[in-house]
């Protein structure tokens, strides 16, 4: 949000108006919310922000030559439940020449988390703006569909000047099905125009794909409970969609400890974009209604259920 809105200061917005939309400490500018800069353009963002919401006005502002004004309009349309907002965001992402407008569209589509969001990720990973490419990799890994494996492997091999894109790819391959990742590696290596360091890249990718010991140890009853809980917490950052079936079986296994199940339910609350969310919701609904379980476990299942559902 900080990047999306910073340009409004140059159009006359108050620092306070800007900071209301910015929730990260690194973006602090000054403690005086009334500070503003005089706009050198015909736009007065201060006056614009004071206008009452009007759908037609926001749609009109989408034609502004300023990316910051377009972003303002998109956020307002989203917050006010504009009908067709998802289609509008997708179309704008596909057609806008402004990288920050495209990023705004992607960020808002992530909040909606529908078919348009999942499909636009295929475009985002080849966007000209590195931050969008890097962000799309994270989003793909949060969704977990195997159809995202090939474009990520291709980006790792052919987008070889973007180190952070490559890092994000290698860090999250383990959340996908192992066989799908290996198949994508083989396919990309057979097709790519890249000749230099191919075998070295293959080795790095295959090592990343085979680094699944934490998932295996989490599912193993031979692992200490302390380590299993530690591995559960790691699922909040790396949603292991490939082993969701095993994790759901753990939740319904009467021989597993309540402490471990509670920790796993808490971790599942982070699977907000996962394609396995319906399965997680089904089991959480079952657990929260099971009167034979402890109140603590049912409450945790209830919290996760409503976080994912809403």
Where are these regions (language model features)?
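Caspase-like cysteine protease fold
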Residues: 4-83
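Long, charged low-complexity terminal regions
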Residues: 184, 197, 211-216, 224-231, ...
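Structural detector for internal amphipathic alpha-helices that build alpha-solenoid repeat scaffolds
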Residues: 70-80, 91, 102-114, 123, ...
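Amphipathic alpha-helical scaffolding segments comprising HEAT/armadillo-like alpha-solenoid repeats
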Residues: 52-61, 82-93, 114-125, 146-157, ...
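Eukaryotic acidic, Ser/Thr-rich intrinsically disordered low-complexity regions
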Residues: 285-310
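Short inter-helical turns and helix N-cap capping residues of alpha-solenoid HEAT/ARM repeat scaffolds
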Residues: 65-66, 97-98, 128-129, 160-162, ...
């Amino acid at each position: 949000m900080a990047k999306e809105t910073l340009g409004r200061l140059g159009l006359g917005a108050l620092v306070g108006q800007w900071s209301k939309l910015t929730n990260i400490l690194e973006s602090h500018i000054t403690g005086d919310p009334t500070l503003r800069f005089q706009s050198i353009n015909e736009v007065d963002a201060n006056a614009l922000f004071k206008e009452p919401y009007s759908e037609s006005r926001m749609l009109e502002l989408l034609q502004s030559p300023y990316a910051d004004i377009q972003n303002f309009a998109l956020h307002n349309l989203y917050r006010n439940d504009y009908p067709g907002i998802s289609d509008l965001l997708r179309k704008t992402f596909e057609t806008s020449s402004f990288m920050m407008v495209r990023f705004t569209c992607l960020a808002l589509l992530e909040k909606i988390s529908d078919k348009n969001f999942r499909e636009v990720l295929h475009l985002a990973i080849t966007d000209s703006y590195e931050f969008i490419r890097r962000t799309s990799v994270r989003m793909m890994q949060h969704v977990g569909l195997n159809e995202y494996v090939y474009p990520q492997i291709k980006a790792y091999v052919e987008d070889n000047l973007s180190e952070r894109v490559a890092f994000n790819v290698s860090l999250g391959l383990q959340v996908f099905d192992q066989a799908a990742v290996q198949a994508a590696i083989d396919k990309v290596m057979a097709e790519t125009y890249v000749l230099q360091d191919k075998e070295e890249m293959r080795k790095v990718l295959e090592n990343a794909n085979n680094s699944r010991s934490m998932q295996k140890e989490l599912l193993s009853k031979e692992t200490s409970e302390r380590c299993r809980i530690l591995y559960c917490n790691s699922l909040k950052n790396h949603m292991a969609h490939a082993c969701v079936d095993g994790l759901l079986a753990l939740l319904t296994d009467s021989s597993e400890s309540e402490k471990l199940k509670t920790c796993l339910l808490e971790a599942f609350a982070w699977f907000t974009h996962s394609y396995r969310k319906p399965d997680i919701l089904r089991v959480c609904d079952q657990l929260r209604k099971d009167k034979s379980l402890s109140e603590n476990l049912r409450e945790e299942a209830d919290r996760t259920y409503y976080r994912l559902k809403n």
